[in-house]
Amino acid sequence: MSSSTESAAVTAAENEVDTNAQASREAARLGRAYHARGNVNLIVDSCADFAPEVARALGVEVIPFPYVMSDGEHADDLWETMSAHDFYERMRAGEHVTTSAVTPGHYLEVFERAAAEGTPTVYLAFTRGLSSSVDAARQAADMVREAHPDFQIYVVDNVCPSAAAELLAIEAVRQVANGLTAAELVAWAEEARYYVHGYFTLDSFD
């Protein structure tokens, strides 16, 4: 590697570190304001592709989606149990990865816990266009409403996956911090989700 190429690589890495640090600081500020307000419990899932430090700083619950590799099922837990490096190295080596939806039972467990706490809850769910999980979430939410008629729980199809869903979720935290109620947040999200778009490229069709 030439000195100029090495210098450019170092600069790019430093810029990425600075950007991540700035995002974490902003997320921490939003998280403090969101929790201080305390009137909405926002839940998201791992298909929003949160940077782990941002999710921790915001303090929102992230439901992990399952994926399966040759050694069995794993939880997409924001790289806690398997690093991003190890995951993609296995894929580059030819590992076949499949995914599956979150079960109604898992959603029921999460929503029952939220009902016990009593704070109105909004789940920004991975879009129905790519997964049946939102149907499972709505089924679980209906069961919780039956058991707890006074508890407010809403399931919103976020329409957009990956980083676009992350942006929507971060802005939702901001809206709660600014004072929106759960019902108002749902109305906001059902409109705002159409203003966020994601673009993807593929290395191959394998």
Where are these regions (language model features)?
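N-terminal phosphate-binding or glycine-rich loops at protein starts, especially the Walker A/P-loop
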Residues: 2-64
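Glycine-rich phosphate/diphosphate-binding loops that line cofactor/substrate pockets in enzymes
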Residues: 36, 108-121
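N-terminal glycine-rich anion-binding loop in soluble enzyme alpha/beta folds
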Residues: 41-106
